[in-house]
Amino acid sequence: MAFAIAGTLAFLAVSSPALANSSAAEYFRNRANSTNVPELLSNSDKDWYKTLFAAIDSEDWPTVQQMFADRPDGPLHHFARAEYYLDPKSPKVDLDQIQAWLANGVDLPQADQIIQLGLKRGLENPPDLPSQQMLVSQSYAPKRTLPRSVDDGTMPDSIANAIKQKIVADDPDGARVLLDGIDANLSPEARAEWRQRVAWSYYIENQDAQALAMAQTVPVNGAGAWVAEGYWAAGLAAWRLNEFGQAADSFRNASLSSQNPELTAAAYYWASRALIRSRQPEKAAEQLRGAAQLDETLYGMLAREQLGERLPREDRGPDFDLTDWKRLREVPNVRTAVALSEIGRDDDADTVLRYEAKIGDPSEYDSLSRLARELGLPSTQLWMAHNVPIGAKAERALRFPAPRWKPVNGWQVDPALAYAHALQESNFRTSAVSPAQARGLMQITPITVREHAPRLNMSASYVNLSDPGTNLAFGQENLEMLRDAPATGGLLPKIMAAYNAGLTPVTRWNTQVNDEGDPLLYMESIPYWETRSYVAIVMRNYWMYERQAGGASDSRKALAQGMWPTFPELSGTGAVRLSVNDAPVSVRP
């Protein structure tokens, strides 16, 4: 990229007058330290079962057998025996043991496997299993994603790959020449895609006039989801050319043709901005209200902020309470899941609660989902958010699950920010491993372990990144390191970008991205699509977690005012305004 911002970027830090982020931090820290679920196990029970399950996990069968002999019954024995019997390396289980297990109930998720094992041992007349109700799939929270590439055979792979290579090599002119040679043979859908890709290549090279001209061809004899992306590219290019009337028209067309809620809201919001710049404020409010209707999107929340409208309270679901417990306390699987959670067997508790959701009374579903949240089981919350009985409706808060985990060194950053990253990085899967060997909740890389282990008084060779507390500790250390890096300047959008792409690209983008000191323009002009999407998604996640805490959002206020939100400290968030060429800097009072 040949462009470099002339002059310097002047900035002034402004501390936030309201410590909204501190209320979110306090909310999530308090959740980790208190619960409305009664304890079912005594301390001695917890110690005993931890020892028993550790013996099963380590295949210490003599210890397992002795412990069952010494204590033949207890609240988690039925589950523990199922784990013991079904382990492929455990001693052979005879028919009498299987029949005794089945006589104690078949509500556990292992019951079918136990019956199958019994049939191999000569079991006759096996008991009926509970019937499973139909669960209806629910929609996912919207994400800013590109349309799928058109694969209809009209674009030869060789030319597609050659165009991509030109784009990667920062050669949009070369990509354009290749496209011109095949354009007439493409389907309308493929034509829209490849014209948009070339237009975007011009845009990220800061060749805005060429980007606008190319983007305007996308809807001409083009069709499909890529048309909206073409209008979007045209809008951004026109914006940077100060052609705000053209930008407004392009953004409005993008909002009308978009098939993605996040892009739709973004287009409405940017149309409003462009109309203000083109001195048509009477038309801007209508566009802003269009964005505000999509209140679970990044720009929908920004629009609500700018309009001064309160966000719906439904995103902070009701807490688990005594009424819920009275409804569930006699359900065997509920008691099993609660007890498993008490001894740290979250994966097992997750399995049991999911199974209960399938076999239980549909009227218990709401209470069951609130129990999953109260126990801090993120995987269960996500699953229940997207699988509900007929006639039920999942609370939206479940799509942004709140665990009860905390870093081994205590919270140093806003938990809402850590959860926002973890949701996008791993979907809260503690065992997630990427092709680059990034591991766990916050996808910690080997180099991150080596860099931060000494500060955490850990040996890099013996770090268990599958442990949530350990992984969160490394994640927040990484966030603080990025906060302090000169490349980010402590600015939240750049910190998020660096978490995904690394500091080297962010350093390069500081001079290559023509953002005009505008944080939203920066976010929309990040050259890497993955990082551009990542920043939008994580920022949205962060605001959704702040909504759960019931407080305002300093970072959302800052962006709505055209300011850069800074890293959210536990005491609150500041904001800065950047200007190009040392122009005067206005600040928020």
PLM features: what roles do these ranges have?
Residues 7-8, 18:
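Cleavable N-terminal signal peptides
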Residues 21, 29-123, 127, 132, ...:
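Alpha-helical, heptad-rich or low-complexity scaffold/stalk segments
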Residues 34-41, 65-75, 85-89, 100-108, ...:
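Solenoid-like repeat scaffolds
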Residues 42-52, 81-82, 156-163, 193-196, ...:
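Alpha-helical tetratricopeptide repeat
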Residues 82-86, 95-108, 117, 188-192, ...:
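Catalytic glycan-binding domains that act on GlcNAc-containing polysaccharides
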